[in-house]
Amino acid sequence: MILEERPDGAGAGEESPRLQGCDSLTQIQCGQLQSRRAQIHQQIDKELQMRTGAENLYRATSNNRVRETVALELSYVNSNLQLLKEELEELSGGVDPGRHGSEAVTVPMIPLGLKETKELDWSTPLKELISVHFGEDGASYEAEIRELEALRQAMRTPSRNESGLELLTAYYNQLCFLDARFLTPARSLGLFFHWYDSLTGVPAQQRALAFEKGSVLFNIGALHTQIGARQDRSCTEGARRAMEAFQRAAGAFSLLRENFSHAPSPDMSAASLCALEQLMMAQAQECVFEGLSPPASMAPQDCLAQLRLAQEAAQVAAEYRLVHRTMAQPPVHDYVPVSWTALVHVKAEYFRSLAHYHVAMALCDGSPATEGELPTHEQVFLQPPTSSKPRGPVLPQELEERRQLGKAHLKRAILGQEEALRLHALCRVLREVDLLRAVISQTLQRSLAKYAELDREDDFCEAAEAPDIQPKTHQKPEARMPRLSQGKGPDIFHRLGPLSVFSAKNRWRLVGPVHLTRGEGGFGLTLRGDSPVLIAAVIPGSQAAAAGLKEGDYIVSVNGQPCRWWRHAEVVTELKAAGEAGASLQVVSLLPSSRLPSLGDRRPVLLGPRGLLRSQREHGCKTPASTWASPRPLLNWSRKAQQGKTGGCPQPCAPVKPAPPSSLKHPGWP
């Protein structure tokens, strides 16, 4: 993506009316959840600071009575943190209910919550940098700074639609402009960017602008998940839009994972991003299945259509099994909500049972395959892994044999659906999602009714063993990069000049204004290029040489008019219009860099969907090693703690003799 700069003439500091956040977080359900998440984040931050101060006091004092009091207070703080973490996990683990103005009931999806951030004051560092490096009055850029701050404030509460995505990408593109104009390998803005982890609520802060860009990119992916989960997937078009949104979300997480290392928060670690990418691809695959199987138009007698649906369902089940294995392994197991892992497991069992159900429908209600169709139909099945018999035809043609095999597949479908209901009942958060239970129960009732129809009292034949279903899909979803160009807008600080010259990476000296009079051979200089116009050559002994102009200077003002954005023809026309009085020019001369950047200072910059993120640790600006900036104290609140519970609340520490500070933390905390 090429950054678009606007020439002079556009009003500085004008805020586009479409780039505005939600007026109130409480207008919609998602806004209410986001508002509550923000409150919990602030409470967690406060409790962490209290715990840090108490631990420092414990280490500093040698009075046993004071230590006992501090240890007791720490136990209360740890209990409060545990409760806050569990509440945040419930909010983060909430799933989409699956009904959006439609009579049909669909399986719920998993949307991600947005990362929260604190307000940021851009004014002081930007004004100082504009004054020191660019040689201009920083106060004259207050309108631009206010526009940037308003844009950042608005992107904290984006609407859950395309306008919200446009708002986030607009701010992301402005960060790219800021990176290109104001940052160098040896200089950062000196601001601390403070963001809360989306999964754990742990606060993290860094001075690197890359952390801000990475967090915004994460929110772009998270907003795509919310848009996808809100679609009405009971119709083909809604399923297509949902699949598109989940693919865009997977692309955002993939881009972040490939180009952002040493993440300060768990949700942006490589392991978490990989798990989120797999989850989004599995949900996109589920949308493919839903787009193929509108219940009203399905003909049970269409054997080939039923077998294709069976393979599509088996493909969805395989995707969710992969996601479940990833979520069950550390460190992802310690980050993601328990309800996510449970829902993924339920879906894996549900879609595997659905595959067997569709095969049973094909065998029992469909017509036998012809000799030419038989090889294609048999590719649906996999032989049982424990079978030692030689492989024979797996798709019988006789009516009774088809009934027996269909009955075996129905049995596996019923067992799988009952297992899905059992797993659903084990998770308290999922139990609150009645629609999920309704979907599984409805499918189970259909399977039981069909099984009762096939069952006979005089059927004493040995039950056949139903083979596994070969996963296959006609459309494999792929991660797609988010449309970072849809929010592309002009550079807010365009008045400073074109980025090719007027950036913190270059040093220059302002010359002039100098007065030029026309001689016999003109002004004695040759111009080239646009925005800004370059003095390509100066004739020795000419008027330009006498005025001190040099080859390589850039013209920034003609007769008092700023011309940094003028084209070559405009500058030439203005100079030709000068009469005997001549013209007044102001130029800048580029200076050699005082120090060439070393190899370690050369870091890529993410300017678009195919670029790279600048390293988040700016040279010479280290993030303070504060205890609340580390994600580790909160990552294992409930997992290990609940394993060691014997009932009731955590027991307060009552040390008889001074214990090391690490023993004051909740069991299972690092």
From Swiss-Prot:
SMART domains in UniProt: BRO1 (SM01041), Hr1 (SM00742), PDZ (SM00228)
InterPro entries: BRO1_dom (IPR004328), BRO1_sf (IPR038499), HR1_rho-bd (IPR011072), HR1_rpt_sf (IPR036274), PDZ (IPR001478), PDZ_sf (IPR036034), Rhophilin-1_BRO1 (IPR042715), RHPN1_2 (IPR047138)
Domain BRO1: 108-457
Region described as Disordered: 1-20, 616-670
One GO process term, biological-process aspect: signal transduction
Keywords from the UniProt entry: Coiled coil, Phosphoprotein
Cellular compartments per GO CC: cytosol
Every REM-1 domain range: 23-97
Modified residues (Phosphoserine): S24
Record's subunit section: Binds specifically to GTP-Rho. Interacts with ROPN1.
Family: Belongs to the RHPN family.
Comment on protein domains: The PDZ domain mediates interaction with ROPN1.
Its biological purpose: Has no enzymatic activity. May serve as a target for Rho, and interact with some cytoskeletal component upon Rho binding or relay a Rho signal to other molecules.
Protein name listed in UniProt: Rhophilin-1
Provenance organism: Homo sapiens
